[in-house]
């Protein structure tokens, strides 16, 4: 089998303690998020999608409805699940890896946008986190860059949904490992990226966002994300 340019690791589980009780729109559906990830690829980027499943999926779990390889990992918490993900990714032969949590939606041709960023920056996210426009960041100054078809802005941190080269992941593995191993539930993503910035690594977010987490008050702005699941 040919080695893909990008390996997409879509992470799922039967139940998540840190996800329970989060405020989500009524139209949110994890199966539709996974279907959207597949349906919105351009087909022009050499990539391979794999499911990383924390634990053993139930027989009626939606991941079984997809013709996608499933790799079972043993995490048990969000932090340990992310830890198992980076351990798996470190051994990949592809040039890049894209970690995707199970509650994300993507716009059409997200793979082409992602690749533009990966060719330029250490770390890339397609999620334009709305907290960057609140009072906490009103004095924050960011570098803005332009690639072939989109703007990018440097951001201090993002979630566990991001992309980088395997080379970069290996270079920074100790930092990723440390902030996952220290997290009791979540993986301390904010502190992780601040530490990476201190090391001289840079994280850029597409502007506008080309993906979003599906939380009621934290969706990437200026796009009708519900339209992606109404199709």
Residue ranges of each PLM-predicted region?
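Active-site-proximal specificity loops/subdomain of glycosyltransferases
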Residues: 52-94
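Short loop/turn segments at strand-loop or loop-helix junctions that form parts
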Residues: 6-19, 54-55, 126-129, 208-209
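Conserved catalytic core of nucleotide-sugar-dependent glycosyltransferases
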Residues: 105-176
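Short loop->beta transition adjacent to catalytic acidic/histidine clusters or analogous donor-positioning motifs
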Residues: 5-6, 40-50
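N-proximal low-complexity "stem/linker" segments adjacent to membrane-targeting elements
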Residues: 1-36
């Amino acid at each position: 089998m040919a080695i893909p340019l990008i390996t997409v690791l879509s992470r799922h589980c039967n139940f998540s303690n840190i996800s329970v009780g989060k405020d989500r729109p009524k139209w949110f559906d994890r199966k539709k998020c996974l279907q959207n990830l597949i349906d919105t690829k351009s087909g022009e980027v050499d990539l391979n999608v794999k499911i990383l499943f924390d634990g053993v999926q139930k027989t009626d779990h939606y991941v079984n409805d997809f013709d996608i390889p499933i790799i079972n990992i043993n995490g048990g918490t969000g932090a340990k699940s992310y830890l198992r993900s980076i351990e798996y990714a470190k051994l990949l032969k592809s040039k890049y890896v894209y970690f995707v949590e199970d509650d994300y939606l993507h716009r059409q041709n997200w793979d082409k946008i992602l690749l533009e960023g990966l060719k330029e920056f250490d770390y890339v996210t397609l999620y334009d986190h709305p907290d960057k426009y609140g009072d906490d960041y009103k004095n924050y100054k960011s570098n803005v860059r332009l690639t072939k078809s989109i703007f990018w802005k440097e951001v201090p941190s993002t979630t566990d949904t991001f992309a980088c080269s395997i080379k970069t992941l290996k270079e920074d593995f100790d930092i990723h490992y440390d902030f996952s191993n220290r997290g009791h539930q979540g993986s301390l993503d904010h502190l992780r990226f601040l530490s990476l910035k201190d090391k001289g690594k840079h994280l850029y977010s597409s502007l506008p966002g080309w993906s979003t987490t599906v939380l009621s008050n934290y969706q990437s702005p200026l796009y009708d994300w519900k339209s992606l699941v109404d199709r």
